[in-house]
């Protein structure tokens, strides 16, 4: 949600900011703006809409070597040019961009801004106005910035520009990601590494409640007590080409096609020199010794967690629960004596999940994070981390991260089962290899998936997904993909729940996509298909080879049934993609959605 870019150096800041913001589009936004400084003053450009709209509004003749930029996802105040960042102080001396939520902005307004008329509806403007009030009362900019930060309650990543000192950008963070990229006679600030790869791949991570003074020659990190902090730098394991679409029309399609490669990479990552699956011993021991596992996640990661729970309970024989992070924070269940918490987050920055992590760490419990981003907040704050190694996922709708999460959870469960002396009953390495081949075969059948999307989903307003057992969990993910990018009201249901209310929604022509990959419930789901067909539904059955029937719309390659979610989801991803495409929707950047949800 939202994104920040800042630059100070010798190059054209305007172009670096715009290109950086383009790399942050995947995070979700509804407006954008930049502020650049030169000898003529500070020039602010803001627009509601896409970065392309902002680029068109920027004066191409303005040259600058310093500036800050922002993509906004509205939390306080409607999406508009007025509420877009950057925001300026009353005198125009200070310009500021901010990600996060300032929870006490109303109180700050009452206490410090009696004589200031706010121009926007945002919490952000309050921050820059308070900074100016402190400067008006005699403090220098750095001290005014520090004093203001000490007043703030909530989450923030902030970049501040003082027009009387155009050689410095002031930066701070708390509960919202922010990096400082290091260069030769320049430095950059960004919400994530993708925005800075155009100029550097070396960066330092900021910790909560730290402030930074950034010039073209130096980066000075301090805590809010004013004490200097030392920090090692990292090299981003990304190349600029990793975040390009290449020949693909959309990132989502590219990322769907990358799933076979990701599967093979995961197998290689978690194999030892003898070809045996392996994870660090302290992690498998932590799971094996737990009396209950609590999986915490949101959205797609939650759906992956539902599948992972089955692996952990069925293979490792460890009781497991799956909880939506935002609900767990406020309704924590009665915990077991020796729990292990597993947090699943593609970005590693999900605010709801982090809030739970903070809670359980205070209680003294151990936590494991599954994430795609090394060095992310969740990976730093958890006791253990398992990386997905899926590569950058740019499209807002997650695809390859979902299957990577399931694969890593399967490996975790299998290794834990072995450490507990439990027999898996099959060779997981071999079966995951078969999965990779099946994924490849499915990705080669896009024409068939497009035909299904046209036939069932081009004009409908509603769609239902039904399944039983593991298929039900995949139906939840399939329905989420469809609603995310096509805006069709799609819902996933357990087949057995149809008769308890849902079947009342079935009418002539209602699309019902049914998964049939589990032999022990095959007759039951077939009965559910007959139920909805009798009431006028238009059924689309996707079955596993060996379980197919004559009227099935599509048959999946044969794979181990317990791993079927890794392949059955791919047709659902492709069907959602083509449904959105033919309905004229923005596939990679659906309305109102953010890739990385960094506010609660």
Swiss-Prot record:
Parts of the chain that traverse the membrane: none
Domain of life: Bacteria
Key words of the record: Aminotransferase, Cytoplasm, Glutamine amidotransferase, Repeat, Transferase
Family annotation (InterPro entries): GATase_2_dom, GFAT, GFAT_N, GlmS/AgaS_SIS, GlmS/FrlB_SIS, Ntn_hydrolases_N, SIS_dom, SIS_dom_sf
Reactions this protein catalyses: D-fructose 6-phosphate + L-glutamine = D-glucosamine 6-phosphate + L-glutamate
Active site residues per record: 2, 595
E.C. number: 2.6.1.16
A single GO BP: protein N-linked glycosylation
Domain Glutamine amidotransferase type-2: 2-217
Ranges of residues in domain SIS: 283-422, 452-590
One Gene Ontology MF term: glutamine-fructose-6-phosphate transaminase (isomerizing) activity
Subcellular locations according to the entry: Cytoplasm
Main subcellular location: cytoplasm
GO cellular component, one term: cytosol
Protein role: Catalyzes the first step in hexosamine metabolism, converting fructose-6P into glucosamine-6P using glutamine as a nitrogen source.
Record text on subunit structure and interactions: Homodimer.
Name listed for the protein in its UniProt record: Glutamine--fructose-6-phosphate aminotransferase [isomerizing]
Native organism: Bacillus licheniformis (strain ATCC 14580 / DSM 13 / JCM 2505 / CCUG 7422 / NBRC 12200 / NCIMB 9375 / NCTC 10341 / NRRL NRS-1264 / Gibson 46)
Gene this chain is encoded by: glmS
């Amino acid at each position: 949600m939202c994104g920040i870019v800042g630059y100070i150096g010798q190059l054209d800041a305007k172009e670096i900011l715009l290109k950086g913001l383009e790399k942050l589009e995947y995070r979700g936004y509804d407006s954008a703006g930049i502020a650049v400084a030169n000898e003529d003053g500070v020039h602010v450009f803001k627009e509601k809409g896409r970065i392309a709209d902002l680029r068109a509004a920027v004066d191409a003749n303005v040259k600058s070597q310093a500036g800050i930029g922002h993509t906004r996802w509205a939390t306080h105040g409607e999406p508009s040019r007025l509420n877009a960042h950057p925001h300026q102080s009353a005198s125009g001396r200070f310009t500021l961009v901010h990600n996060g939520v300032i929870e006490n902005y109303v109180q700050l307004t009452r206490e410090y801004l009696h004589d200031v008329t706010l121009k926007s509806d945002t919490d952000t403007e309050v921050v820059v106005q308070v900074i100016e009030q402190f400067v008006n009362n005699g403090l220098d900019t750095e001290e005014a910035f520090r004093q203001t930060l000490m007043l703030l309650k909530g989450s923030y990543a902030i970049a501040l520009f003082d027009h009387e000192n155009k050689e410095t950008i002031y930066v701070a963070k708390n509960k919202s990601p922010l990096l400082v990229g290091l260069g030769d006679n320049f430095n950059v600030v960004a919400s994530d590494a993708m925005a800075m790869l155009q100029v550097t791949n070396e960066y330092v991570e900021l910790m909560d409640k730290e402030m930074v003074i950034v010039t073209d020659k130096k980066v000075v990190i301090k805590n809010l007590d004013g004490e200097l902090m030392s920090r090692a730098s990292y090299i981003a394991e990304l190349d600029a080409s990793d975040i390009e679409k290449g020949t693909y029309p959309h990132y989502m399609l590219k990322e769907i096609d990358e799933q076979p490669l990701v599967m093979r990479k995961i197998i290689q990552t978690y194999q030892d020199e003898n070809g045996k699956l392996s994870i660090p011993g302290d992690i498998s021991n932590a799971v094996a010794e737990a009396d209950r596992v609590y999986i915490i996640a949101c959205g797609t990661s939650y759906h992956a967690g539902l599948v992972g729970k089955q692996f952990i309970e069925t293979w490792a024989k460890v009781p497991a629960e799956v909880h939506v992070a935002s609900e767990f924070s406020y309704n924590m269940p009665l915990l077991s004596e020796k729990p292990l918490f597993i947090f699943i987050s593609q970005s590693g920055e999900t605010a709801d999940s982090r809030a739970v992590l903070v809670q359980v760490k205070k209680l003294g419990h151990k936590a494991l994070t599954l994430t795609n981003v090394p060095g992310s907040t969740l990976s730093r704050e958890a006791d253990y981390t398992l990386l997905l190694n899926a590569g950058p996922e740019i499209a807002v709708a997650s695809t390859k991260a979902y299957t990577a999460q399931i694969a890593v959870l399967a490996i975790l469960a299998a290794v834990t089962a072995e450490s507990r002396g439990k027999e898996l009953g099959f060779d997981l390495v071999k079966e995951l290899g078969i999965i990779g081949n099946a994924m490849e075969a499915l990705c080669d059948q896009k024409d068939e998936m497009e035909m299904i999307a046209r036939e069932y989903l081009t004009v409908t307003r509603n769609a239902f997904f039904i399944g039983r057992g593991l298929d039900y969990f995949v139906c939840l993910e399939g329905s989420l993909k469809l609603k995310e990018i096509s805006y069709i009201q799609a819902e996933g249901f357990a087949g057995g729940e149809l008769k308890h209310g849902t079947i009342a929604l079935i009418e002539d022509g209602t699309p019902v996509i049914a998964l049939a990959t589990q032999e022990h419930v095959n007759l039951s789901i077939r009965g559910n298909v007959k139920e909805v067909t009798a009431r006028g539904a238009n059924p689309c059955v996707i079955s596993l080879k060996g379980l197919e029937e004559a009227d099935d719309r599509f048959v999946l390659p044969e794979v181990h049934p317990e791993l079927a979610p890794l392949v059955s989801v791919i047709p659902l991803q492709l069907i959602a993609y083509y449904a959105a495409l033919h309905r004229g929707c923005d596939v990679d950047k659906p309305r109102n959605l953010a890739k990385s949800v960094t506010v609660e």
